[in-house]
Curated annotation (Swiss-Prot):
This is S-adenosylmethionine:tRNA ribosyltransferase-isomerase. Pfam families: Queuosine_synth. The lineage of its organism: Bacteria, Pseudomonadati, Pseudomonadota, Alphaproteobacteria, Rickettsiales. It is found in: Cytoplasm. Its main location: cytoplasm. The gene is queA. Monomer. Its EC number is 2.4.99.17. GO terms for molecular function: S-adenosylmethionine:tRNA ribosyltransferase-isomerase activity.
Length: 371
């Protein structure tokens, strides 16, 4: 199929720049005939006793680092305990063996690849990489979320040297500009760009379908007899990479680490055997269960998946998919077209745009049924 077949006109004002006032107050579009627009807190009305929700428990790390002046990197994938791949901007200002200091810690450029990708090594003083990122990093918000007053556009002026530590310069910057709580946007995003059930650190972008859930909703689902199970897929920066080939089957899909425990595999297989509905919460969950499914059976394990789901794909696991609204010509829009129908998804998105529903990471959700 051609890439142009997955295009549609999306007004820029529908790109959500911030989350809804409350997690479950976002809109939810049920892909019925005709579509039903409601609030996410009503999702329980569209699920029934015995249903199984499968959710991604990966936790977003603070993967964005300001290295020097206007140079930033966004971590992509863990290569070893102290090494990661990353995307740099701009790469022309970086060289192999460049060293950047954050107080007593050091980040070293070890390799420059293509398309802005680099490899970095962390030389840290008695803390883990995740502990380092939690102190010095920022939430890796997608580039289409723009905050004119945010620290994301100002800390890039702060350089890191051994003589002038990061913490001191940053604190001075906050005092000088009278910024409270080290920028309210950052404090807010640290909470809202993370699911409430996230546990396993490793994602550099949020599994956004899960952002709408609250503890109250999870409690009500349990009371109604709706089951939950958790798996892990660490979302990589490649999730935002555009498809550049007109023939979509020539696109090279990025790889992402995923894992399913024996307990979760057993829960999913039992639901399938008992013919209960399985609802994948997010495209990351759907890609994971389909990656692990062989002849209708989920087997526990972990590996790197590069599964690319396009129309014609034979789904073996999920009956329904809860997901946010996706970019035109993206691999995720191709996925939902494969799951719920090419024509049907174009029509549903036309309806969503007419209803001014909010798109992408901080946007609204839709509940799809497998065609």
């Amino acid at each position: 199929m051609k890439l142009s077949a997955f295009d549609f006109n999306l007004p820029s004002e529908l790109i959500a720049q911030s989350p809804s006032s409350e997690r479950d107050n976002s809109d939810l579009l049920i892909a019925a005939m005709p579509p039903i627009k409601t609030k996410f807190y009503n999702i329980i009305d569209y699920l029934k006793e015995g249903d199984l929700l499968v959710l991604n428990n990966s936790k977003v790390i603070k993967a964005k680092l300001h290295l020097w002046k206007n140079v930033t990197i966004n971590l992509n994938q863990k290569l070893s305990d102290d090494s990661w791949s990353a995307f740099a901007k701009p790469t022309r200002k970086l060289h192999v063996n460049d060293e950047f200091y954050f107080d007593n810690h050091k980040v070293i450029i070890t390799e420059k690849l293509v398309m802005g990708e680099i490899k970095v090594k962390f030389d840290l003083d008695n803390i883990s990489v995740f502990e380092f990122l939690d102190k010095y990093g920022e939430m890796p918000l997608p580039v289409y979320i723009r905050r004119s007053h945010s620290l994301y556009h100002t800390t890039s002026t702060l350089c890191h040297t051994r003589e002038n530590g990061y913490s001191e310069k940053l604190d001075a910057f906050f005092r000088r500009n009278d910024i409270k709580d080290k920028d309210n946007d950052i404090v807010y995003d640290n909470e809202r760009y993370q699911t409430i059930y996230s546990q396993i650190e490793g994602s550099v972008a949020a599994p956004t379908a899960g952002l709408h859930f609250t503890n109250d909703i999870l409690d009500k689902l349990k009371t109604k007899g709706i089951h939950t199970a958790f798996l892990t897929l660490h979302v990589g920066a490649g999730t935002f990479l555009p498809v550049k080939t007109e023939n979509i089957h020539e696109h090279k899909m990025h790889t992402e680490y995923c894992s399913i425990t024996p307990e979760t595999a057993e829960i999913i297989n039992k639901a399938k055997q008992e013919r209960r509905r399985i609802i994948a919460v997010g495209t990351t969950t759907l890609r994971t269960v389909e990656s692990f499914c062989n002849n209708g059976i989920i087997k526990a394990g972990s590996f790197e998946t590069d599964i690319f789901i396009t129309p014609g794909f034979k789904f073996q696991t999920a009956d329904m998919l809860l997901t946010n609204f996706h970019f035109p010509k993206s691999t995720l829009f191709m996925l939902i077209c494969a799951f719920a129908g090419f024509k049907e998804m174009h029509e549903l998105y036309k309806y969503a745009i007419k209803e001014k529903m909010r798109f992408f990471s901080y946007g609204d959700a839709t509940l799809l049924y497998r065609k």
